[in-house]
Amino acid sequence: MILEHVLVLSAFLFSIGIYGLVTSRNLVRALMCLELILNAVNLNFVTFSDFFDSRQLKGNIFSIFVIAIAAAEAAIGPAIVSSIYRNRKSIRINQSNLLNK
């Protein structure tokens, strides 16, 4: 695969994730956009690792760490969202002011 094509794909995924994270008002959608950003970062890690030095696996190892962090976020995030919904009866970001109670 050509490096430029993968970088364009990764930049496109990252841009969609940032746009969704900034404009979404729903916490579940924001978590999904955060996962999209992490996947774009993983794609960059693996691509640069393969392109510059395919014998060393530093990019792949970083990618595994990011996947582990994303898995923890995917497990804890919905639990936090469901807890917020139970307490506030809404998962909209602009309606849930967590500091007022």
From Swiss-Prot:
Origin superkingdom: Eukaryota
Keywords: Chloroplast, Membrane, NAD, NADP, Plastid, Plastoquinone, Quinone, Thylakoid, Translocase, Transmembrane, Transmembrane helix, Transport
Any Pfam family the entry gives: Oxidored_q2
Catalytic activity: a plastoquinone + NADH + (n+1) H(+)(in) = a plastoquinol + NAD(+) + n H(+)(out); a plastoquinone + NADPH + (n+1) H(+)(in) = a plastoquinol + NADP(+) + n H(+)(out)
E.C. code: 7.1.1.-
Positions of transmembrane segments: 2-22, 32-52, 61-81
Record-linked InterPro entries: NADH_UbQ_OxRdtase_chain4L/K (IPR001133), NUOK/Mnh_C1-like (IPR039428)
Molecular functions (GO terms): oxidoreductase activity, acting on NAD(P)H, quinone or similar compound as acceptor; quinone binding
Record flagged with keyword Membrane: yes
UniProt GO cellular component terms: chloroplast thylakoid membrane; NADH dehydrogenase complex
Protein's GO biological process: ATP synthesis coupled electron transport; photosynthesis, light reaction
Subcellular location, record wording: Plastid, Chloroplast thylakoid membrane
Topology of this chain in the membrane: Multi-pass membrane protein
Biological role: NDH shuttles electrons from NAD(P)H:plastoquinone, via FMN and iron-sulfur (Fe-S) centers, to quinones in the photosynthetic chain and possibly in a chloroplast respiratory chain. The immediate electron acceptor for the enzyme in this species is believed to be plastoquinone. Couples the redox reaction to proton translocation, and thus conserves the redox energy in a proton gradient.
Family: Belongs to the complex I subunit 4L family.
Quaternary structure, from the entry: NDH is composed of at least 16 different subunits, 5 of which are encoded in the nucleus.
UniProt-recorded name of the protein: NAD(P)H-quinone oxidoreductase subunit 4L, chloroplastic
Gene label: ndhE
